[in-house]
């Protein structure tokens, strides 16, 4: 008996080699073993991403294959798997997978090659079913501590990044029932036209305030005369 035949026999339990119900069970098990459902995978490569249409990833299943004689063999790479993005119409949260991420890969019941190309209803290119070639990636499972995040917790929401946070819109409004505060070392507002601050409580400063080149704390006046006359306007120092 050849080694391959020995391996085939090793895949079956003794009761499955004696005919009858055991043989039927072996046949069903063989069919089911060829059906891919979902499995954990690690991202090997990300293609596209950022402010672009949803891209693809190359992934490797984490649960190894076992032959009939017990030999453990790592899975190969599954290429060009579409990944999930939280998106509705033109609105999206862009968090692209990165190499090393662990996620779930689900496998479709039919060949989705044409749909991936056309992004429209299409006929299957083959009769394959539940195949590794028709996977979809959903991240992230079993991953480490994030470095930047949005944390929804009791009492509020925390947005954190060790880098810069940029907001860009036609208009940005901050509506706070209490107040808006900043503990940063500097606060700078550069407007192209008009900067306006209004409020019933007034504006206070622990340091100097300048209007163009005129200091509020230390400025001379033009046209100063003695007596009851008023001085001229403040001038820059």
Question: For the regions a protein language model found, what residue spans apply to each?
Answer:
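Intrinsic-disorder/coil detector with helix-boundary
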Residues: 2-5, 13-16, 170-237
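Hydrophobic packing positions characteristic
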Residues: 2-178
């Amino acid at each position: 008996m050849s080694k391959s035949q020995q391996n085939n026999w090793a895949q079956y339990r003794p009761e499955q080699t004696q005919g009858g119900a055991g043989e039927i069970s072996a046949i069903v098990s063989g069919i089911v073993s060829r059906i891919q459902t979902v499995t954990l995978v690690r991202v090997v490569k990300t293609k596209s991403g950022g402010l672009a249409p949803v891209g693809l990833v190359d992934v490797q299943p984490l649960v190894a294959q076992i032959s009939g004689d017990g030999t453990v063999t790592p899975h190969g790479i599954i290429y060009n798997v579409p990944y999930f993005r939280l998106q509705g119409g033109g609105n999206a949260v862009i968090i692209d997978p990165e190499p090393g991420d662990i996620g779930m890969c689900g496998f479709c019941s039919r060949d989705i090659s044409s749909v991936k190309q056309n992004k429209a209803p299409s006929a299957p290119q083959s009769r394959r079913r539940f195949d590794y070639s028709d996977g979809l990636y959903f991240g992230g499972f079993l991953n480490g501590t994030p470095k930047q995040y949005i944390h929804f917790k009791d009492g509020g929401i925390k947005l954190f990044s060790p880098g810069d946070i940029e907001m860009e819109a036609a208009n940005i409004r901050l509506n706070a029932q209490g107040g808006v505060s900043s503990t940063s070392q500097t606060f700078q507002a550069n407007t192209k036209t008009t900067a306006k601050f209004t409020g019933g409580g007034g504006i206070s400063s622990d340091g100097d305030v300048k209007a163009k080149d005129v200091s509020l704390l230390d400025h001379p006046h033009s046209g100063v005369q003695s007596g009851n006359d008023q001085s001229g306007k403040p001038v820059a120092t």
